[in-house]
UniProtKB/Swiss-Prot annotation:
Pfam families: UPF0149 (PF03695)
Protein name: UPF0149 protein XAC3406
Family listed: Belongs to the UPF0149 family.
Species: Xanthomonas axonopodis pv. citri (strain 306)
GO terms for cellular component: cytosol
PANTHER family on file: UPF0149 PROTEIN YGFB
């Protein structure tokens, strides 16, 4: 299932008077789900830690974002994608969106996992690496082609790290429960 268009997510986010970008919303949602948080229509209230937050309109871009994200995280073909910025955005905007995504992921993951979850050694490393990325900024990149390639590699690393953490916190326990 494909993610909704980033512009549609931004538009609906503005309609709900949210200060978060599409990248931050997706990062927070992915963190929430990867940390074992429930897939529910009121996901915004959960990741924003605001019980007064209205649930997204059913069938709207934010609801589609939740549904597609759940489907992608559960996909056995590892079809998970990051929702960052519009295609063709300048390198600084893309790097800032990725680092914002990582910060939001960590927040959502922490809210869902609450106490430190049992992670594999690789999961621990992935979480630490995501924390380092969350501290970075676009100032760490130039506009050179090498930086464009480096950003693509970092995006792929983040994608794999998220799948690994989701596997440790959600898929692994679910599989072990089925065995018992």
């Amino acid at each position: 299932m494909d993610l909704p268009d980033v512009t549609a997510v931004q538009h609906e986010s503005r309609q709900l008077a949210l200060a978060s970008s599409a990248a931050e919303l997706h990062g927070g949602l992915c963190g929430w789900l990867s940390g074992g948080g429930a897939d529910s229509a009121d996901w915004l209230a959960r990741i924003l830690a605001d019980s007064g937050q209205v649930a997204p309109r059913q069938g709207g871009a934010l609801d589609q974002l939740r549904q597609a994200t759940v489907a992608q995280l559960e996909d056995r073909d590892f079809a998970f994608e990051l929702l960052l910025v519009e295609d063709g955005a300048p390198l600084p905007a893309r790097t800032d969106a990725l680092f914002d995504w990582c910060r939001a992921f960590l927040g959502g993951f922490g809210l869902a996992a609450q106490q430190r979850p049992a992670l594999s050694e690789e999961g621990e490393e992935a979480l630490q690496d995501l924390a380092r990325l969350a501290q970075a900024s676009s100032d760490d990149f130039d506009t050179a082609d090498e930086d464009d390639t480096a950003l693509a590699e970092i995006e792929e690393f983040v994608r794999v790290a998220v799948l690994l953490l989701h596997g440790d916190c959600v898929m692994g326990p679910r599989f072990r429960q089925r065995l018992n």
